[in-house]
Amino acid sequence: MNSLGGIRSWPANWRSTTASMTTTESVRKVPQVLTVAGSDSGAGAGIQADLKVCAARGVYCASVITAVTAQNTRGVQSVHLLPPEFISEQLKSVLSDFEFDVVKTGMLPSTEIVEVLLQNLSDFPVRALVVDPVMVSTSGHVLAGSSILSIFRERLLPIADIITPNVKEASALLDGFRIETVAEMRSAAKSLHEMGPRFVLVKGGDLPDSSDSVDVYFDGKEFHELRSPRIATRNTHGTGCTLASCIAAELAKGSSMLSAVKVAKRFVDNALDYSKDIVIGSGMQGPFDHFFGLKKDPQSSRCSIFNPDDLFLYAVTDSRMNKKWNRSIVDALKAAIEGGATIIQLREKEAETREFLEEAKACIDICRSHGVSLLINDRIDIALACDADGVHVGQSDMPVDLVRSLLGPDKIIGVSCKTPEQAHQAWKDGADYIGSGGVFPTNTKANNRTIGLDGLKEVCEASKLPVVAIGGIGISNAGSVMQIDAPNLKGVAVVSALFDQDCVLTQAKKLHKTLKESKRGI
């Protein structure tokens, strides 16, 4: 083993010679992430958080340490930078051996260290680079000097696929630009995008006077505001590292950028929610549990990729309607999502299993590319086979508790409920949301008893879960449904109002507009 200052001479054919030791027939590809960051002795952030996140998301993670910190829940007491020569040795060691899908950077506390990283990334290209410009922690601790701002702007940001600054870091990168509102976050994201990264995510978790946690995502053309309720907890140490590492892990698994960002935000939200009452350390900012998804309590780990606001415009497909209008399920799905559908349920009553599976795989590709969840109606086997985001089951289908045991804690499970008793049972069994109805008469389901607006409100009041209304809902009555004064009513599910129409895109836009207007009127 070399000393810290020693540099090993690596043979040019190092990777190719070792790769020949494994036959192609025996290879099973494992998603791989490299994190280049500082060590946190308290283990809530930095390298330690990165390793835990990747393990929790099912991704292999290697590490290169740039600095060693002395810190705990009370703050950062000291920072020791490792010699750039030794950091280069670490980088060469892992980059010459592993085939990383994504490199994620955290604390890069000197220009020399950034230079070393840039040189090694030039020598060993990777598919994606996630840059978390760790300069100011959420708690306000300064972790990097101002001298590296120029090299970040001029050299690192232009090669990044995504950067994930908090508002303080975004302000520093923009020469002190003031960021105190969502509008200013949007302006900052646009200005940062002009520096070269393909995507920008400005994190607003510490935005002053905001009841929500709001992150602004910008792809160069469109803005996405990713909102979630602010969670009251002291255990927020390492949220930025966790978010960036989760994005890297999802990218390594093949997700689109928007989908990776959405999954990462929900992962952090649910980790914070699960950990809000734990006590580790005596300081003001504690760590949280990255492995909440492994806990046995079905209530403790639900919704790891589920945001109740995704129920807003819930599109349920119908193959017969698509055939009637001479369009494929893929075309129908694209139009619905582009028009504003926020979640998709694939319902197929006619196709054989193999045909249904191929259809589901095609739909998964469309949904993931747009960051929209896909649920399978009834068929647990299809959901497992295509790795859908979840399922929706009825009262006569497989019991929810058994579905949860088969799918695990990460998948979304919805269940149809007509009564308060059914709604209560859905919560106990581990469902994530309730589909309640039919609210009005409908032709899409035979002999379906309607419950009306009063019945819908009763279910909402009895439920601890978010609710989506379904049954006979369209542009003419969607507003009245959303105005029944039930805070946990998150949206409407539609079938014929979308898919039994000449233009799915136009109808989706109209429905989305109607729902937004009704929500503002509440």
Curated annotation (Swiss-Prot):
It is found in: Plastid, Chloroplast. 2-[(2R,5Z)-2-carboxy-4-methylthiazol-5(2H)-ylidene]ethyl phosphate binds at T442, N443, T444, G472, V495, S496. Its cofactor is Mg(2+). Its main location: plastid. Mg(2+) binds at D378, D397. GO terms for cellular component: chloroplast; chloroplast stroma. GO terms for biological process: thiamine biosynthetic process; thiamine diphosphate biosynthetic process. Signal peptide: none annotated. It comes from the Eukaryota. Keywords: ATP-binding, Chloroplast, Kinase, Magnesium, Metal-binding, Multifunctional enzyme, Nucleotide-binding, Plastid, Thiamine biosynthesis, Transferase, Transit peptide. Belongs to the thiamine-phosphate synthase family. This is Thiamine biosynthetic bifunctional enzyme TH1, chloroplastic.
